[in-house]
Every structure is written in structure tokens, then in C-alpha cells.
Amino acid sequence: MKIVVIGGSGLIGSKLVTKLREQGHEAVAASPKSGINTLTGEGLAEALKGAAAVVDVSNSPSWEDSDVMKFFETSTRNLLASETAAGVRHHVALSVVGSERMLESGYFRAKIAQENLIKASSIPYSIVRATQFFEFVKGIADISTEGNKVRLPHVLFQPMAADDVASAVGKVAMGTPVNGTVEVGGPEKFRLDEVVRRGLAAWTDSREVVADPHARYYGIEVSERTLVPGDDARLGETRFETWLTLPASKAAAAALVHSFPVPLAFVVRRLENSRSMLPPILPARPTAALVKTRPAPRFARG
């Protein structure tokens, strides 16, 4: 079966392409690098010829609210139109658990808009919502650090390995469209501060993790269950303590990336607008240089 993976060169996409090929499928890694651009429509018609399914794990290259909305709406419309013309019978999209509970962020408003476009189309579909990845635990610490303290809300957290995300998406893509949403998460529930504390300890990082009821998660106010899936979620196999011993853990610890699809500029604006109400998780006077030099935060969709 031919399956086209949009965003096929990213963290999840590259793993997914490998897994699909191991199962004997013709998996096409589609991205601007390979001449396939969903935002402009370039290369889509040719790439989708003969495809039975399309999996979209792509992400916006810009993190401004208007740019993110434009990316997801435009690319999804282009993709769905091309799929209709090519006769694709299964559209799979990777989204985020709790998106509808985090509409304070323009990114999640855009993800909901993407989901709504998919639901309104005539193409059978499956939306896979995943929890945060183990690979980005360090990024959560980095963006929540002041001095030597990491301040985080003491809320439930059910992260999973990126490899398990790719496996879950692959199983859905190879199956029958559910015409609905599938949630996937890790095999264990933790408290957010607990996961970060364990990760930093494993990486011999001396920062102190503090559970702060007033702390926000990337500038977003979260409640007890904002970040966890429902009880019927499909669970990955990799436990956090096991993952911490793997090469992926060491690579994640060494990487300077931010781990959630909320741009630093958004966090800065939230803090500047509500300084007295928020914990000091960023310098008191964020500068343009800081915004420009920090890598783009991401919940790696691709």
C-alpha cells in the first residue's frame, strides 16, 4: 500500500516512514526538502498518485499566531483537495492531546481549525492526538527555569516516546479510518514536576524543580487533566525510566530545543501582559535578541 507521509523528514515522520517500509508498504517521505510543499501545493499531485493513505505530521515553519493559522488552514485545504483528486481514501493527521483545553495559544487554535477542516471534508479520516514526548522533557525545564530553579505546575502528565508515537500513527494509517479521534499517551501517569525532576537527575543536571501552583506551562494556564488523555487512550510501551537509558535520552539532554508548539514570543507577551500574576519563568526583561536566538519551540509533529 502506498502511504504518503507529509513531514516525512522530521522526528516523527522519519520514524514513521521507516516503520511503514518495514511492514512492506511503499512509504513516501514528503516534505519541502523533497519538492513537496503543502503550503504552496507544489509537488502534491504527483506525490499522491496511487496513494491509499496520507499521513500529515507536518508543522508550521513560523510560530506567530497568524502564520500558524495560515499554515494549518492553507496546507490542510491544499492537501485535502489533492487527496480528493487523487482518490485517497484515508487521511491521517497527528494532533495534540488537550488542544481544545489550551485555546489560550494561537497554535492550538490552529490545530483545532485543522481538525475541523478534516472533519468537514468528504475523505475518510483518523485524527491521532498524542501527549508530549519524552524527547522534550529537557525543553520544558529550560523554558521554565529562573536561576537554578525550574517552576512547574503540579498537574498530571502522561508523556510518551517519539518512537511509540510513530508506531501508534502507523497502526492507524494501516487500518480502517475511524472518522474520529484516537488519543495516544505513555504507559504511566506522573506529575509534570516529577517527570522533569527525574529527567534532570538522570542527566546530572543540578537545577532544582519546584512544584508551583501558580506556574504556567509555556505561558498557558493548565488544570489537573489538561495534558493527559482520556481513559480509553491507546498506550505506548516505553516507560520513562527505560527511555532514560536509551541513546535518544542522551541526545535529548544535549539538544537545545523547546518542547511545545508555543512560540517564545507568545510566552514573552503573556508574561509582559500579566507579569504580576505569573511566575518568573523568563528573565524580567525579555529582549528581542533572546527571542531571535532561542530555537523555535516545538511539539515535533514532523
Description of each model-found segment:
Residues 2-21:
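N-terminal Rossmann NAD(P)H-binding glycine-rich loop of SDR-like oxidoreductase domains
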Residues 87-90, 95, 113-136, 143:
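Conserved beta-loop-beta element that borders a ligand/cofactor-binding pocket
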Residues 125-126, 139-160, 164, 183:
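A conserved pocket-lining segment of Rossmann-fold NAD(P)-dependent short-chain dehydrogenase/reductase
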Residues 135-147, 172-182, 205-207:
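Glycine/proline-rich active-site loop of Rossmann-fold NAD(P)-dependent oxidoreductases
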Residues 165-169, 184, 192-195, 243:
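Non-catalytic, hydrophobic alpha-helical segments
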Residues 225, 232-267, 281:
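Amphipathic terminal alpha-helices
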